[in-house]
């Protein structure tokens, strides 16, 4: 099974918009990119459902400091379990933009997206410590 070029563009747009919303600390815009039954999990806990997601991201972002940039690096899109599902693996880099610029976090991100009508939405986002290549 393959993910079409048009779907890849839409999927990567959703992933990029999620990190842009996180940078702006816009919890509503962030949550709107997820399915109603979405799961966000990783080192900051496990949050299930869009309401829990909306409530949890504020404290998660606040723990990063007053301002951070969320950057998605090297995203690769893979087919998911069905024709309306895709998986994106990438590196999430969280940067403190104050001088001197510092990297706050480098993490491995795996996101599952499902087609929801004519759009794609994140159904699962797992953030884990980045590992060194062997």
Label the model's feature ranges.
Residues 94-104:
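Short, cysteine-centered beta-strand-loop-beta hairpins and adjacent loop/turn segments enriched
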Residues 70-72, 104-109:
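Short, surface-exposed coil-to-beta transition loops
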């Amino acid at each position: 099974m393959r993910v079409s070029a048009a779907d890849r563009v839409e999927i990567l747009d959703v992933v990029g918009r999620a990190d842009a919303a996180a940078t702006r600390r816009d919890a509503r815009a962030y949550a709107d990119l997820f399915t109603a039954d979405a799961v966000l999990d990783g080192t900051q806990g496990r949050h299930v459902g869009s309401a829990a997601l909306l409530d949890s991201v504020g404290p998660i972002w606040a723990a990063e400091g007053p301002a951070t940039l969320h950057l998605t690096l090297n995203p690769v899109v893979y087919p998911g379990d069905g024709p309306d599902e895709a998986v994106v693996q990438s590196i999430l880099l969280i940067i403190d933009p104050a001088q001197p610029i510092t990297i706050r976090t480098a993490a491995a991100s795996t996101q599952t997206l499902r087609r929801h009508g004519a759009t794609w939405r994140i159904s699962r986002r797992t953030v884990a410590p980045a590992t060194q290549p062997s």
